A protein has these predicted regions:
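Short active-site neighborhood of thiol/selenol oxidoreductases, capturing the structured segment around
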Residues: 77-100, 106, 119
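Extracytoplasmic
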Residues: 61-63, 82-84, 114, 141, ...
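N-terminal targeting signals for export/organelle localization
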Residues: 1-69, 202
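A short beta-strand-turn-helix
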Residues: 58-60, 65-87
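Thiol/disulfide oxidoreductase modules built on the thioredoxin-like
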Residues: 136-143, 148-202
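Hydrophobic alpha-helical membrane segments, chiefly transmembrane helices and signal peptide h-regions
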Residues: 9-20, 87-90, 105-109, 113, ...
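Short, ordered coil/turn segments that flank beta-strands lining enzyme active or ligand-binding pockets
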Residues: 19, 71-73, 172
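Structural microenvironment flanking redox-active thiols in thiol-disulfide oxidoreductases
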Residues: 100-139, 150-157
Length: 202
C-alpha cells in the first residue's frame, strides 16, 4: 500500500472513532476497587436488577464465548448463551464521557421496554465501586444489570474497536443483528433501532 493510501486509511480510522473514548484513563485501574464492605453498600444503593441466567450454548453469529462476573447481584453470565429474548448489550465505562452522556437514554429505554427487551451492560476497564456509584447517580438511575469486563474481552473477542461505547442488539435466537458504534443521542434513536432490528415497538 502506498504512503498516500496509508495516510487516508489512518484518517478514516480516526474519524470512525471520534465519538468513542480513545482509551481508558491511567487513573482507572482494572479490578473490583475499594474494600468488600464498601462495595456491598454500593451494590445495595445502586439497586441493579440481577444478572440474567445464561446457557452454555454458543450461537453462530452471536456474542463472544466469554463468561463474565456480575457487577451487582446474580450469576456470572456466559455472553454467548444469552438467548430466549431480544437483548440490548451496552459496552460502557464510568470513566468514558460519551458513555456518561448516553446512559440516561439507555436507562429510560430499559424502563420503557422492561419485560419485552432485556438490557445488559458490560462495564469495561473500570473499578466496580466507580461503576456502581455512577449507575446510582444517573438521572433516571440505571437499574438494568451489568457484567464486569476488566480485560475488554467482549470488545476484543468480537473484533470491535477497543473503546466504548458500543451497543450490540441481539435477537432472541442469540444472533447479533446490529452494532452501534458511539453514543446514542436520544432515547428515541435507541427505541427506533430496537423496533427495526429486534421488532419490538415502544
Amino acid at each position: 500500500m502506498s504512503r498516500r493510501r496509508l495516510l487516508v486509511a489512518a484518517l478514516l480510522a480516526s474519524a470512525a472513532t471520534a465519538t468513542a473514548c480513545a482509551s481508558s484513563p491511567s487513573s482507572v485501574s482494572p479490578g473490583p476497587g475499594g474494600d468488600q464492605a464498601s462495595l456491598a453498600k454500593l451494590i445495595v444503593t445502586a439497586d441493579l436488577r440481577p444478572c440474567p441466567a445464561s446457557s452454555t450454548t454458543v450461537v453462530a453469529g452471536g456474542l463472544p464465548n466469554v463468561t463474565l462476573p456480575c457487577l451487582g447481584n446474580g450469576p456470572a453470565v456466559h455472553m454467548a448463551g444469552l438467548t430466549g429474548e431480544p437483548t440490548v448489550v451496552n459496552i460502557w465505562g464510568s470513566w468514558c464521557p460519551p458513555c456518561q452522556a448516553e446512559m440516561a437514554y439507555l436507562s429510560r429505554a430499559a424502563d420503557a421496554d422492561r419485560g419485552r427487551v432485556r438490557f445488559l451492560g458490560v462495564d469495561t476497564v473500570d473499578e466496580a465501586d466507580s461503576a456502581l456509584d455512577f449507575d446510582a447517580h444517573v438521572t433516571p438511575p440505571v437499574h438494568f444489570p451489568s457484567v464486569f469486563d476488566v480485560d475488554r474481552k467482549v470488545l476484543l473477542d468480537a473484533h470491535l474497536p477497543p473503546s466504548p461505547p458500543v451497543t450490540l442488539l441481539v435477537s432472541a435466537a442469540g444472533k447479533v443483528v446490529h452494532t452501534e458504534h458511539g453514543a446514542y443521542t436520544s432515547t428515541a434513536q435507541l427505541q427506533a433501532q430496537i423496533a427495526t432490528y429486534l421488532h419490538v415497538s415502544a
